[in-house]
Amino acid sequence: MHLVIVSGLSGSGKTTALHVLEDVGFNCIDNLPVSLLPALVAQIEIHKDQAQKFAIGIDVRNAWQDLSLFPKMVSTLKEAHLPFHTIYLDSHPSVLIQRFSETRRKHPLSDKSTSLEEAIALEQNLLEPIRDAADQTIDTSHLNLHELRDLVKDRVVGRTEATMAILFESFGFKHGTPVNADLVFDARCLPNPHWKPHLRPQTGLDADVVEFLEEQVTVQEMYADIEHYLTRWLPRYQANNRSYITIAIGCTGGQHRSVYLSERLKKHFDQYYQDVQVRHRDIHKHQKHHNHAPANS
């Protein structure tokens, strides 16, 4: 039996997260009053020997007095020795405002006397006890719908299977550092295929770029150092009950060097861990700017 509590700001993706969990076999209950959590836990405890999975959505539609009780409810769950964890979905206020504008939905706390900005600020304050007690916080500011679905699935499914999910994510520093990264490695000091005209339009997935980078001594030295570091410390993360870890590898544009390193690391650690993923966040962004600026990568 496993219990996941999902909370977060309105517009941050809580409903999407619950739908993902429902798709992978969780029994989902949305907008559960916090005051009813002990009663639900008691029922779950009766059937805790059964292989069931539950996901509960808790949000600002609760009375504010109930939300303040959440830390006490977490203590109750721990005392019952139930396997559970809490996910909190967050997002920057400007992104939330844009999402509400695009969907034309009304914020649950906004009214004639409360602006959208004020409603978001009030919600942040009301949900603070849940955010502080959460095991995982996911910032969805820069995630689209599909990326959020994949991230929730990777992290929750990996945790319920008692494994540590590992994500290698390549990116370009010029596009910003991934907000959910646990470890960040900087590959901008390595020889850059961008300055080879025939390699410029290619990526770290292409054979010519791979061949070029494998011929560079410094590239191989950095790869060996990262591999050694992760080999040494990933078991410690796993022993500390981590359900996931995101390892970001960055170069300037996220097209060549970071892609190559991420792919190679993924291939190596696939041999030792059950759930290893790779994601290339910015690999195609250079195509949009290729004719306008020298987007180094």
From Swiss-Prot:
UniProt-listed Pfam families: PapZ_C, RapZ-like_N
UniProt binding sites for ATP: 8-15
Entry keywords, A to Z: ATP-binding, GTP-binding, Nucleotide-binding
Protein's organism: Cellvibrio japonicus (strain Ueda107) (Pseudomonas fluorescens subsp. cellulosa)
Name of the protein: Nucleotide-binding protein CJA_2809
Free-text function comment from the UniProt entry: Displays ATPase and GTPase activities.
Family: Belongs to the RapZ-like family.
Matches recorded under InterPro entries: P-loop_NTPase (IPR027417), RapZ-like (IPR005337), RapZ-like_N (IPR053930), RapZ_C (IPR053931)
Region forming the signal peptide: none
Chain sites annotated for binding GTP: 59-62
Any GO molecular function: ATP binding
